[in-house]
Amino acid sequence: MSSKKRKSYFSNSQLPKRKKLFLQSGMKGFFCTSNGKEKDCIREALNLLDEQYSKICPKTEENEFRKEDIERELEKEVEELKNRCFSDNKPFQVIETDVKSCVFIKTTVNDHVKLATSIFTEIKDQKKCKSKFLIRLLPIEITCKAYIDDIKKAADEIFDVHFKCEPTTYAVMYNHRCNNSVLRAEVIEALCVLVRDRNLNHSVELKNPKKAILVEIIKG
């Protein structure tokens, strides 16, 4: 018999399959679009978000280094992968949209809009593209069903923060995919009414608004 120490191996079959999470009302996160290669898009988006999140909210505990033998490291890696599959507390989770080239990443980060903005600012300042398959990444403050009443209710929940303020300019940017039942003009008019309810002196500015209301509709 060989006196050499046996190596430990593990395969993907040892890991639980990732639970599929589906898009629901009341979520917040990031809406991502890809060039068709969704897995690569997800990888880039998660890496980008994790990297920026660690800069804004560094975890000193994760910087501690401990020497462990190979078997211990492998056991730890398997356990971490299992926890990643089932943990609901992790900051970023991929959500199924059932729409090709569209990905939603749910987040528990408190100010995820600030996180996204910091990514945009860094890319602009460094003049360096950080993704190949991730085409767009938009912070989403709230999700709802694709019905006009649900859209109005969701907007009403978040508009006080953005429009109970001094007069400003704004624009509604509307996009839809796999849905023809929601009328663009109806959505824009309804949201403009809600904005004016906060301050009658807010005005629409399509070319260079100070605030933008992003509406992304996918499916029905």
Question: At which residue positions do the language-model features occur?
Answer:
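SAM-dependent transferase fold signal centered on methyltransferase-like domains
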Residues: M1-G220
